[in-house]
């Protein structure tokens, strides 16, 4: 099975440090960055907006050999993807998307149109929401299990619309009568479904609908039993599921340089998590998020966050998102990624600050090493 690599696009903000609380390159809300302020000497805007910066990151990822880019939750990833499709030629866009944001029939039509305009470069990172406070702020008052039920029904309808000229559905949350895609869009490729979640309701949805089941990084041996369970559940559905890994990287020329620079940045946090990270972890009901939090909760010493070869569990102390990341030389990082690949992972969603420069560096220095490394074992995938 071939390996695919995605690069995360920093839709929120970006900067040279793990934490962007102090140093950043602006954000989509037109806050000027304190690194590249976007101002002319007379104080006027230079007309360069944050989406222009994101476009540079996307072009860098494409140039560096990444197959696609993740557009995480943030200021409307759909619109950003439509803009970036005009700036790139082959880069696929993995759009983070929640069922609560729109009705499934309309989402299917939106996806088909974007597939048509981008020549089939759209995939979905279907998320269900792991922060009840954030969900309520969007008008979503369903509990954890109900949200996954909605996601499952949402994907039932998407599948039905794509596979039938007319489709009706009668679920607990959604109903549809004689729905259809516009005739001229019916032949567009259905977006691939990249899905994650550790709870039982999440695994049920994954078994029925996921093309790629995503995990946050943990020690390989900790992930193997969980992957095996997903494989068995998918097999009962007669489906094949591939496995993916989301992981932040901190790569330098040498391993010593990587750990030294990371320690320096960690010390600047003064033992305090970033504002966004603290708000994210304190209100989450995500089972997968709880697994990540357990690796760093109540741990303040840098060395105590080292949980395996080149594995460090302190990334979430600087920013929201994955806790465990890879730290080391380009060769170290490539070796660890190859180990995950040999354990059955064929999709990798990578990231590193600053995203523009690191896309080029990782693409040039790390990806070729992973692609050239011999496969040590057969991939662990669900078989039809």
Regions found by a protein language model. Name each.
Residues 101-116:
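Glycine-rich anion/phosphate-binding loops
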Residues 10-12, 74, 98-100, 127-129, ...:
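Active-site beta-loop-alpha junctions enriched in small/polar residues
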Residues 3-9, 68-71, 92-97, 122-126, ...:
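Hydrophobic faces of well-ordered beta-strands that scaffold small-molecule active sites
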Residues 61, 65, 84, 114, ...:
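Conserved, mostly hydrophobic/aromatic
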Residues 2-45, 138, 144-189, 218-341, ...:
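An alpha-helical appendage that flanks or caps ligand/catalytic pockets
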Residues 78-98, 150-152, 235-239, 243, ...:
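Alpha-helix-loop-beta-strand connector modules within alpha/beta enzyme cores
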């Amino acid at each position: 099975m071939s390996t695919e690599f995605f690069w995360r696009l920093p839709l929120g903000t970006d900067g040279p440090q793990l934490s962007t609380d102090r140093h950043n390159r602006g954000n989509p809300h037109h806050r000027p960055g304190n690194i590249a302020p976007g101002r002319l000497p007379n104080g006027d805007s230079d007309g360069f907006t944050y989406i222009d910066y994101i476009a540079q990151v996307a072009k860098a990822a494409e140039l560096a050999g990444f197959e696609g880019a993740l557009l995480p939750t943030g200021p409307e990833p759909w619109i950003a993807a439509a803009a970036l499709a005009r700036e790139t030629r082959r880069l696929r866009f993995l759009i983070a998307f929640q069922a609560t944001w729109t009705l499934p029939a309309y989402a299917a039509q939106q996806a088909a149109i974007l597939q048509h305009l981008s020549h089939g470069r759209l995939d979905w990172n279907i998320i269900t929401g792991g922060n009840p406070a954030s969900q309520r702020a969007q008008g979503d008052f369903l509990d954890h299990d109900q949200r996954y039920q909605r996601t499952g029904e949402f994907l039932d309808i998407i599948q039905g619309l794509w596979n039938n000229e007319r489709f009706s559905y009668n679920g607990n949350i959604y109903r549809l009568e004689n729905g259809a895609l516009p005739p001229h869009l019916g032949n567009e490729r259905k977006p691939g479904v990249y899905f994650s979640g550790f709870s039982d309701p999440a695994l049920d949805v994954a078994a029925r609908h996921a093309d790629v089941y995503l995990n946050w990084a943990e020690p390989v041996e900790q992930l193997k039993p969980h992957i095996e369970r997903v494989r068995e559940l998918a097999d009962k559905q007669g489906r094949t599921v591939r496995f993916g890994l989301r992981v932040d990287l901190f790569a330098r020329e040498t391993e010593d340089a990587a750990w030294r620079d990371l320690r320096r940045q960690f010390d600047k946090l003064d033992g305090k998590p970033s504002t966004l990270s603290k708000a994210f972890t304190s209100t989450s009901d995500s089972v997968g998020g709880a697994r990540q939090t357990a690796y760093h909760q109540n741990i303040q010493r840098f060395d105590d966050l080292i949980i395996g070869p080149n594995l460090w569990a302190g990334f979430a102390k600087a920013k929201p998102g994955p806790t465990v990341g890879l730290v080391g030389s380009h060769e170290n990082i490539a070796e660890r990624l190859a180990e995950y690949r040999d354990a059955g992972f064929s999709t990798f969603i990578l990231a590193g600050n600053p995203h523009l420069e690191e896309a080029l560096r990782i693409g040039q220095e790390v990806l070729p090493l992973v692609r050239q490394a011999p496969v040590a074992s057969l991939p662990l995938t669900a078989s039809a």
